[in-house]
A protein has these predicted regions:
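Pre-P-loop entry segment of helicase/translocase ATPase cores
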Residues: 2-69
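Conserved ATP-driven motor cores of ASCE-family P-loop NTPases powering translocation/secretion/packaging/pilus
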Residues: 368-370, 374-412
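P-loop NTPase motor domains
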Residues: 49-376, 391, 401
Length: 412
């Protein structure tokens, strides 16, 4: 644990924190590097340790100092509606992290966090980006298909398949029916095949990534189903690739009733793209290099409507894709330098408000476990532990175990 070095931050947020003398037993016993309680640790600190920042845990009334956890520890924040999670944890954390230039990816259901902290970060030299799913025209653009297409174009076929599969699972196979998962799985396989078919066509016809987007995936779906498959030239072209054929044949050449069920499921999952041209445009290209998040001070705000859940799958997908892509590039650079494990140059902090409201992120327990050695931290903010159990079931214990800091807030 260390002191935050910017005293103005301490003065701004001190009223929200317990003093050292008022800490509960769990906080007093909590020690990151030594076994002695916080009161004894305080005597050893040099004033304003610089560059060591993290989630705020306590405040000293005597020295007007906020104490933070600057290690690679993850944090779980539990508090019901009205417990001021954003004001007590999220906003102070952003200002503290911003004072040291650490990167952040922040889910922001109400855009309140962005409105209160973006200008501060910009003044501190941050590159600030906004993916605004509430108002797609007012923010940056992000195409989730660009990265896998780049892998495909450079011959990294397995990696391209991996990233496309992540997209299919997060957009199409979310909230699978327990009784009949066949429809979601089949729709996901259909999406996987369409994406690879689009990659194949664009790569072989010299078309760049501007042609690779959700709108053209929907267009391919329509062309493939426009005429019977026996005389469909696009289907004949698709079957020249075994992987694409295997992914699509279960829909294209199946019985009519089964085909109708799969297509109905698929169309329902992608409807938000087909009926919202502004959203489709936002997801058609990239305005920023995702890999730079782990290289230079960057803040990405993921603004999503909190009154409906239809867009939450895109937030889960961004979290998954950004994590995987940054680690891939860090590992690639490490291998070039003869190092075993790739570590991000600039620490990235995922601050995920309403985390348990997001669709399940595939492999998240493994992500949160491996993040520590990659210079990545997670702050997971939920309303109750029960919500987390509902979402991640048997994997909840792994997530909780990897969060050494637990902060409980009450609205009373």
């Amino acid at each position: 644990m260390s002191r935050v070095f910017d005293k103005s931050i301490s003065e701004k947020y001190s009223k929200y924190f317990s003093s050292i003398g008022e800490l509960t037993a769990s906080f007093v016993e909590y020690s990151l590097a030594q076994s002695e309680p916080v009161q004894d640790q305080e005597k050893k600190f040099q004033p304003w340790d610089t560059g060591k920042v993290g989630v705020p845990l306590a405040w000293s009334r005597k020295s007007n100092t906020i104490f933070v956890d600057h290690t690679d520890t993850h944090t779980l924040v539990v508090g019901p509606t009205g417990s001021k999670k954003s004001r007590l944890v999220v906003m102070p954390s952003i200002r503290i992290l911003g004072s040291a230039g650490e990167s952040m990816i922040i889910s922001d259901p109400k855009a309140e966090i962005y409105n209160r902290t973006a200008s501060y970060l910009e003044q501190n030299g941050y590159r600030v980006f906004v993916l605004n799913l509430r108002s797609p025209m007012h923010g940056q653009r992000w195409n989730p298909l660009t990265i896998p297409f780049e892998f495909y174009s450079h011959g990294e076929i397995d990696k391209a398949y991996e990233f496309v599969n992540d997209i299919a699972e997060n957009l199409i196979q979310t909230e699978k029916s327990v009784r009949e998962p066949f429809w979601d799985n089949s729709a996901g396989s259909f999406f996987f095949g369409l994406a690879l078919l689009l990659f194949k066509y664009c790569h072989e016809h010299g078309l760049d990534s501007t042609y690779v987007h959700m709108g053209n995936i929907i267009e391919l779906r329509n062309v493939l189903l426009s005429v019977p498959y026996q005389r469909n030239r696009l289907w004949a072209y698709a079957k020249s690739d075994q992987i694409i054929a295997a992914a699509l044949i279960g829909t294209i050449e199946t019985a009519s009733d089964t085909k109708a069920g799969i297509l109905s499921t698929f169309d329902q999952k992608v409807r938000m793209f087909s009926i919202q041209p502004n959203l489709l445009d936002m997801l058609s290209t990239n305005d920023f290099d995702m890999n730079r998040i782990g290289a230079v001070p960057t803040a990405v705000f993921l603004i999503v409507p909190d009154e409906k859940t239809g867009y939450h799958s895109l937030v889960s997908l961004f979290i998954k894709q950004s994590y995987e892509y940054m680690i891939f590039n860090a590992q690639l650079e490490a291998e070039r330098d003869g190092i075993h494990t790739g570590v991000l140059k600039n620490r990235v902090n995922y601050i995920l408000d309403e985390f348990s409201s997001l669709p399940t992120i595939r492999d998240f327990p493994a992500m949160v476990t491996a993040a520590r050695s990659r210079n990545i931290r997670f702050t997971l903010i939920i309303q109750s532990k029960h919500q987390l159990i509902q979402r991640y079931r048997d994997e909840t214990e792994t997530i909780q175990t990897n969060c050494n800091n637990w902060i409980f807030l009450t609205s009373r």
